[in-house]
């Protein structure tokens, strides 16, 4: 597998929107940086080779959150079993924005050494569901038996985030955090790494970084792992991009595992108007590069080997979603994203875009009138008008469509709700739209039958889980 190289077009030169940048390596600012091992994501189709959904949206391209195919007979959803969470500080419960369960089909020899129940150990092709909760716990379920596969990990602080597991098969869990305090307790905040043989935390990387220019420290986005160099990659609300050379040591015969991370961070300041530090969304990755946007609306392609921006552009409004990438047979690589009204207290056009991931050029922008209605009360609570959910890259019968869920849209009759838009990947023209009756920040999930028939599953702020026809909406 050979990934293409990226190089900025004239319109996407980093110096046009970035005022300065810096790299922290070994705890010190350095003038130049080069990773000790080549960090390159490799074939994205092999990320989930062991089976399952191992990170937010399935893999480094962040295209979907499903694995395998489905057989649909009745086109209805039903609850098989519900699992209750507890309540933390009489405030936090359930699963927050950006919280997606993982599904891990463990290798048999790994499963047998872990502290899961005997019933789950004996389940053929056992699939474990792992989901952190805002009640301060990380839950583990057996997807087949619908029972707990092992005890919850108790952190005691809100972790309504999406975790990730090591794609190489190592029994490692990487978990961020969205808050550091309750009314009675202030703890640590950052990235936790757990040994899933015994569920013990074996490393903690703080996000209270002296070099950070942002005022918040949450690590809400899900990390990804580049297996070749054993590198963990993630962003934080403090405005930094982190890479951790994990130096994992796994003794299969003795069932022991350890890590010895070396942290590197990339930060920057912007020259655009109203620049503010903060990263809400996570990274997508292709080849040597990671792609992410910030709360100002600066979208960057950063080389993981040099920790320098290859290209950067200003979207004009906040980018709060994790972008999606798509590779094409001719070598083209494209990025899909959208904006949210996080900078301005007004109503404005929401931008839905396709961008050349190798140059930073805008390929198209949706021309449909999508007016987001800014609401200060909702924004203060972290819910913004626009694209907070990650787009769904269509496959099967909808392989020509890109699906966006846009929150808090003002319709022609002045009513406000989320709207799902299906756009043509080539032109950006609207193929169909489906207004919901409430707001929604849920990233749509694509389900496909063997014949390519498509369905979309997504939730909303009213607590409804919807099944939609992917072809017609």
Language model regions located:
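Extracytoplasmic/lumenal domain signature
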Residues: 1-42, 46, 63-219, 224-473
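Segments forming glycine/polar-rich beta-alpha architectures that bind adenosine-containing cofactors
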Residues: 56
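Acidic glycine-/aspartate-rich tracts in secreted/extracellular proteins
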Residues: 59-60
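Short glycine/Trp-rich loop-beta-loop segment that forms part of the substrate-binding cleft
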Residues: 53
């Amino acid at each position: 597998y050979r990934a293409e190289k990226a190089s900025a077009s004239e319109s996407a030169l980093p110096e046009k929107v970035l005022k300065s940048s810096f790299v922290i390596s070994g705890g010190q600012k350095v003038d130049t940086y080069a990773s000790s091992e080549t960090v390159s994501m490799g074939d994205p189709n092999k990320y989930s080779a062991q089976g399952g959904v191992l990170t937010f949206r399935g893999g480094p391209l962040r295209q979907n959150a499903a694995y395998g195919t489905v057989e649909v007979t009745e086109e209805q959803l039903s609850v098989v079993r519900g699992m209750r969470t507890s309540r933390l500080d009489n405030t936090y419960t359930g699963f927050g924005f950006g919280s997606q369960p993982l599904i891990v089909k463990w290798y048999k020899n790994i499963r047998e050494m872990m502290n899961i129940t005997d019933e789950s150990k004996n389940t053929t092709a056992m699939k474990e569901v792992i989901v952190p909760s805002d009640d301060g716990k990380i839950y583990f379920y057996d997807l087949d038996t619908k029972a707990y596969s092992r005890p919850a990990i108790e952190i005691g602080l809100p972790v309504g985030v999406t975790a990730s597991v090591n794609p190489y098969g190592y029994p490692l869990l990487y978990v961020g955090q969205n808050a550091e305090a309750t009314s009675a307790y202030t703890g640590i905040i950052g990235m936790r790494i757990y040994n899933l043989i015994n569920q013990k935390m074996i490393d903690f990387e703080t996000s209270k970084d002296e070099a950070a220019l942002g005022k918040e420290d949450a690590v809400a986005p899900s990390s990804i792992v580049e297996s070749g160099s054993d590198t963990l990659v993630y962003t934080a609300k403090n405005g930094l991009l982190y890479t951790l050379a994990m130096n994992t040591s796994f003794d299969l015969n003795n069932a022991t595992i350890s890590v010895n991370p070396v942290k590197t961070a990339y930060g920057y300041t912007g020259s655009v108007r109203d620049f503010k530090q903060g990263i809400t969304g996570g990274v997508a990755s292709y080849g040597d590069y990671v792609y992410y946007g910030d709360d100002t609306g600066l979208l960057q392609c950063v080389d993981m080997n040099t920790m320098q921006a290859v290209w950067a552009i200003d979207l004009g409004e906040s980018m709060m979603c994790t972008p999606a990438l798509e590779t094409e047979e001719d070598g083209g690589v494209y990025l899909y994203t959208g904006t949210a009204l996080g900078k301005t207290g007004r109503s404005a056009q929401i931008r839905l875009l396709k961008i050349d991931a190798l140059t930073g050029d805008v390929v198209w922008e949706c021309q449909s009138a999508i007016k987001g209605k800014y609401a200060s009360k909702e924004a203060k609570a972290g819910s913004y008008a626009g694209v907070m959910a990650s787009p769904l890259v269509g496959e099967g019968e909808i392989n020509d469509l890109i699906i966006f869920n846009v929150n808090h849209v003002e319709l022609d009759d002045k009513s406000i709700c989320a709207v799902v838009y299906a756009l043509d990947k080539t032109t950006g023209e609207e193929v169909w739209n489906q207004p919901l009756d409430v707001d929604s920040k849920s990233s749509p999930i694509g389900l496909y039958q063997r014949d390519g028939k498509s369905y979309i599953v997504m939730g909303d702020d009213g607590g409804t889980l919807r099944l939609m026809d992917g072809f017609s909406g």
